[in-house]
């Protein structure tokens, strides 16, 4: 029996990782540790909440004593750390919360893992601390080819209809960090703490940096679910600047599969990039979402294009992110399983079929946040 804590397991990516591990490894005890902030939602895990190898614990990762006690009581062998404040816009409004959760929370987990595992006869043997991070820590890449060029790589996640790169360079694991937002600065700091605990104390750590995820259960402050929800209600679609910023997109279940593989087979002290070689300008992906929603709702194609509303750009908005995940593919054999067009179709269908979930998470405080972010821009 392995006893694994997954932090942030009620969130978007975390819930997919929890579900995968609970269903795939019935001999593991999966402990979902989540504070249940605005983006944490136990409804994301209704389908596995009664499984015998699953337990939910409501706890703040900054609670060192609580985490240490839980590790001792549950004889925890591994930690998969996803809990984080992750929305760049919120980090600009409230950087203190991001520093507290992403930096001090990670430090609390590291210190608890070190203290508990060092107390055991076997110490760190058979243990693992896996920290999930973001491609945003690398900074921004130049968009040297705004018209798009043929990319050097293709994966199963790459778009079949729109497979372009917007520059020659990609994020690789050996790049120096250059975070530009409070969010990415906090994640970069937490990454450094994880590596420092390996280098100083020998803690068996792994770090991964992933590109933008999309799929079911994502809180609708993020681009794709935000726009699906707004199109559904025929509300304006706020697009930063000219919509030219580029991101690499990966279906969330493929990210969860990568986490599973790296947790079990990745090398201690290594960093792995996870991405789909699937670059899209924001404005282009928005148009794909509009066409998909309109088609599935029986509206004329492009009927809601007039909802696109250009607003003042985000402060410090990085122009281009593009991940090179060649190392992960060559060393561990991972590659995405779902092509972009299929993933978008599944994603839009899920949100349209789960309107009660959307309505529940977009009530109350969400509307206040939305008005604060996008009114008068």
Model-based region annotation:
Residues 1-213, 253, 263, 282, ...:
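N-terminal Rossmann-like NAD(P)+-binding domain of SDR-like oxidoreductases, especially those catalyzing
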Residues 217:
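Conserved GTPase G-domain signal focused on the G5
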Residues 4, 17, 30, 40, ...:
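C-terminal substrate-binding subdomain of Rossmann-fold SDR/epimerase-dehydratase oxidoreductases
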